[in-house]
Amino acid sequence: MHDQAQMAYWQKDSKIGAIQSYNSNLPSVMDFTLHDAIGGGVFNESKANWDKGIIKVYENFTNDFLYPNTNNILVFAENHDTNRFNQIYQGDFKKYQMAMSLVATVRGIPQLYYGSEIGMKGDKNVGDGDIRRDFPGGWKGDSNNAFSNEGRTKEQQQFFDFTAKLFNWRKEKSVIHTGKTTHYIPENNVYTYFRYNDSESVMVIINNSDEKQEVAVSRFKENTQHYSTGKDVISGQTINIKNNISIEAKSALILELK
């Protein structure tokens, strides 16, 4: 299924299913169309137009009204039946950061496939065995033990540290679990959205272009007017959001607004 209406049909209490007097009673469905964008190479599309670049991600969420419960949708960058993310993007850490920042902050339930957190690769064209390789370590004779800090390579540790920090932050944030979403149509291949509830607000900026961008915060006044700063959840840096925000090429910024 690669259409939101098809997927929404299978979620419990679907209005689309009700047309045929059908209710699957399945509480959760998988966001295959978001995966289609991620797995289709969206983060390689540095030059954007009406059907290229980060607009593909934006358009996925414009159809959320079709789902009975958007908080109970499974979001993922890869799984046991797909190409590994790091196969598609050749281990590009910046693109991994962008994808995981997206998966961790949009509505729904994030799914991590084992090995994502250390940058594992696997080619579906080679066969299912290649995308389901053994996780390195745990057996005598394994040359690489990625179960421990000491056993990971420098590259594996880089992926692991980022993933751990991001998702440990997420697990404490009800604003991400059940908060509302406001998103804005991308400009210059930069996608900005907000997750918020009555007590918190998080601003997410994803720059999919290959150039540093200046993001005009005034465009998002509806969501920023009561805040003056944002804390970067990864670096801990505090950013003034009353002015334009600079964001590096091929990067994501997650800000807790204050």
Question: How would you name each of these model-derived features?
Answer:
Residues M1-L66, G91-F93, L102, G119-K165, ...:
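Active-site-proximal helices and loops of the catalytic beta/alpha 8
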Residues G179-E200:
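Surface beta-strand/loop "capping" patches
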Residues I205-S209:
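Asparagine-centered strand-capping/turn motif at beta-strand->loop junctions
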Residues I241-K258:
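C-terminal beta-strand-rich structural cap/linker in extracellular carbohydrate-active enzymes
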